[in-house]
Amino acid sequence: MTNLPHWWQNGVIYQIYPKSFQDTTGSGTGDLRGVIQRLGYLHKLGVDAIWLTPFYVSPQVDNGYDVANYTAIDPTYGTLDDFDELVTQAKSRGIRIILDMVFNHTSTQHAWFREALNKASPYRQFYIWRDGEPETPPNNWRSKFGGSAWRWHAESEQYYLHLFAPEQADLNWENPAVRAELKKVCEFWADRGVDGLRLDVVNLISKDPRFPDDLDGDGRRFYTDGPRAHEFLHEMNRDVFTPRGLMTVGEMSSTSLEHCQRYAALTGSELSMTFNFHHLKVDYPGGEKWTLAKPDFVALKTLFRHWQQGMHNVAWNALFWCNHDQPRIVSRFGDEGEYRVPAAKMLAMVLHGMQGTPYIYQGEEIGMTNPHFTRITDYRDVESLNMFAELRNDGRDADELLAILASKSRDNSRTPMQWSNGDNAGFTAGEPWIGLGDNYQEINVEAALADESSVFYTYQKLIALRKQEAVLTWGDYQDLLPNSPVLWCYRREWKGQTLLVIANLSREIQPWQPGQMRGNWQLVMHNYEEASPQPCAMTLRPFEAVWWLQK
């Protein structure tokens, strides 16, 4: 294994959801100038790159993941000039820019789709059309947002496929003209100085051409990691990603280790790295998201071990707890009360000790929590609103559903970034597009920066350590307590260096008896005021975590 990593192999990436980051116009919606305004803060944190979720022209049915024009910026967010300034200002601080590419589908407002409504247009073949009867779709596949994955178009008397909202029509990747257009989009942004791309649900781009009924499920096995997915990504990589030096991270929906070993192979023939979500389903009993359930920490550790060991020396992992589709991790796996700070630090220390590229989602670095919404009118997310309506229809209790949304909704991570204890948490001078978290007076950036023992400084140190200690980049992964539901203990080794991580996942004190620990250890990180200089028998406090290093 080489000692000279790609920048992303010992770097850390910060995800920005621009809509909720910083508003500079008083519109109540964040914008690109808001990102520029906060670059100094991101530089202080020490991140290597920022990934921006979509800011393209969009009807905003799915918060910008329904793109109507891939090369134009939605006026809500600013202009191309603003974007160019953002690139320049970020690069002057050593921060790279990663853009989100939504290439599985477009908005039905996209010019291609409008043309495609005419059966004679060449753009008809840009989408997936099938025959059927008005009441009988081509097959029984389900949309990920509920209902059938097919929408009838009366004028042309055919159905089009939409794996997500009906306003998000799936592109037909079998058509070389589609792939050529998408390559042009990548070139457009590479020309403007973009360093990387995050590819939305990119393992869904190849569908089984037979479009069979799924007798045992919702259809996903016929389009997830589909027959030509690797071939298509190989072509995109050969023609655009590698020639333009773009880092790529694929968001992989319901994928497998075996596929990701190919997508993110260290040979670099498809993508640089992959996101998978298996570890964020350990509180989905029986695979069911819309329930209230405690996380299964043994399952969580088993999944991390599977991916850490399976990808080691084969392919590259992306590491994350949070994004714009997930609830806040400290609320989910930690504590919102008296132990919020140690819990947030512990979760950071467990993740950032692993192999891969860590991603931090805005607000995670100050320990932001779920907002505790209590009314359905507080929500904006299409998935949450659809599920509430669908499950109410099935006779489920409204209060129960609201409790589930308060813990599982995607809106939990979409509330405005908490900058200060001032009006609207310093996010906007106007009316915010979605309500604020109810604790922004206590939990905000200003307070975090003023407190040397805040969660922020733990993240800052973890980011710096990643560049200093090669064992973090290249080391293997050994789970030393795989069956403990309360302690997470792992070891990483590389060329005579050893990192030992111990964490208490519970709010109770826990005894820990390490095996024989020879040699000299150095205390590197801890989340309470003091910790043992050496790994030895000890009682771990609630959510306590410690890193020791041996060279």
Describe each model-derived feature in a short phrase.
Residues 1-551:
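Active-site and adjacent substrate-binding regions of carbohydrate-active enzymes
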